[in-house]
Amino acid sequence: MALAQWPPTLPKWPIVQPEKTMPGLLPHVDPNGLLEFSVVYTDRALNHMSQSFQGVMRDISGILKEVYHARSAVLVPGSGTFGMEAVARQFANDKKVLVIRNGWFSYRWTQIFDMGRIPAESIVLKARRTGEGHHAPFAPAPIEEVVAAIHTHKPDVVFAPHVETSCGMILPDAYMRAVADAVHAVGGMFVLDCIASGAMWVDMVECGVDVLVSAPQKGWSGSPCCAMVMLSELARTRIDSTTSSSFACDLRKWMQIMEAYEAGGHAYHATMPTDALTRLREVMQETRRYGFAKVRAEQQLLGDKVRALFQARGIPSVAAPGFQAPGVVVSYTEDPDIQSSKKFLGQGLQTAAGVPLQCDEGPDFKTFRVGLFGLEKLHNIDRTVGHLQAALDRIMPAQAAPSAVQPAAQPA
């Protein structure tokens, strides 16, 4: 008796399904879909092969390309950090890299590199205080220093955070463009972490970004379920000659999965969070209908008003003027119950505890963090500011001040 062929012949992707459908078992999952007898899902989850989910993937890809002006859009299941590691394991293997470290979450690049022994060499340029005293604000490494270091070291890849969540710092467009021009001049690529950017979406073409990493839960008001990785023309060209050092986080493979969906079919690498991605698609479409420019303006205005509120109360910002992010406000404190967020919890607010920067800040560095993400906050700015003001009135009654909702002055 002849033995069965092993390994079996696998289908060629993308697989294009016929148009014929029939009612699914549960109307709230896939009402026009097929009865579920695959080996991947049950009737309670949307199948990745379904016509419905194929539309979800195409819609997400289209919106990501539209907003970021990207050549390619890739979804990597997991979270934003999975996307960071996928990028590192795709483009930084045995390469020379340079990291602009503005705090704990750009220190994460170094943690990923060290854990996986990924690059051949890593240079780090840290944020630093702009003055004396333990409450002096921080600014990123001067752009002249960054450009000089790139020309000297000639890194293959430069990694930077658009918004650093640990200190509430944002890189201006001109800063990013200067980094991009410098690394492109030495033949390298520019990778930008936009996971904490909120609605301050970056134009990859204008800012010269080659790889942009984002996630659903901050800028897109979605449930965390994946990383979004956008590629420029240069990155899309170069990825074909790279090999990932990860199976689950193989960025090129996940790119091929998305391209299969874009071609009108589907493909499989690992199980995707189909229901969470469906909800993400819905809120992305909601944001598009409302207007991307309008949402971005709301993000900036909300950040300005909250920073003005804090400034009026004498609460010092960790980020220096000119680098203050509108989506994350991080402030100094000497009160351990504010640093831990305990006092805000007592007022019904879930804020975030302060974290170190890994930028030589010293042992007396104490902060607390306030996130200003999501359509509910952005569409209701005065209500959002009012919630914070009421909590501060009770937490810091001696420092209570009249309503301060005018935008803080920003340097030119």
PLM feature spans:
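PLP-dependent enzyme catalytic core of the Aspartate aminotransferase-like
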Residues: 6, 10-19, 362-412
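N-terminal "arm"/small-domain region of PLP-dependent enzymes with the aminotransferase-like
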Residues: 1-51, 65-68
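Conserved N-terminal alpha-helix of the aminotransferase class I/II PLP-enzyme fold
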Residues: 38-83, 108, 112-114
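Active-site C-terminal subdomain of aminotransferase-like
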Residues: 217-308, 312, 376
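Conserved active-site segment immediately N-terminal to the catalytic lysine
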Residues: 205-217, 227
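Active-site phosphate-binding strand-loop segment of PLP-dependent enzymes
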Residues: 133-198, 211
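Conserved C-terminal alpha-helix-loop-beta "cap" of PLP-dependent enzymes
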Residues: 311-383
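PLP-dependent aminotransferase-like
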Residues: 82, 92-156
